[in-house]
Amino acid sequence: GGYIKAIYPSEPDNVQKITVRENETDGRCALYLSVLQELFNTDETLQSDTEYVSVDLTETPLTKGEIQAIAWRFGELTERRPLTFTFKELQDEGYLETDELLWEDGCLFKITEKNDENGTLTFDAEKWRAGNGASYFLDCTAKQNKDGTYADFEIGAFAAA
């Protein structure tokens, strides 16, 4: 239960419980939330004085509701205001200084799925704040458990700019 505040971007208000229905999920939401948390905790100086986190999961098969739930929880865990904007949307909404390629008071977190075959999911994850301020998890893999869910992931390579 709960309400949606009449503001933009919308935020859940007075949420008392989130229910996951059995056998209707492959654990991708929990997996991606853990990826975001690990990326947040990597190179912490990148977001040390920020107010916002924007979560871009548009290149995953997650629903809009799932993406919003992940962003909301991620914002809660990181004590930042959550958004679900892409890089372009952040520019369009005036969050980014387009000329300087800088988000002064936030970081963009993006996960891009590359492949999902034979019980192995591959993806990249990035944390971006500026043209020369970014961290990347490349060629990450997650294997499906016997129950069909993804739980743990391995980082293929780490890069920073």
Predicted regions and their residues:
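Flexible low-complexity loop/turn motifs enriched in small/helix-breaking residues
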Residues: G1-A134, F158-A161
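Short beta-strand edge/turn micro-motifs at domain boundaries
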Residues: G2-K5, F137-A161
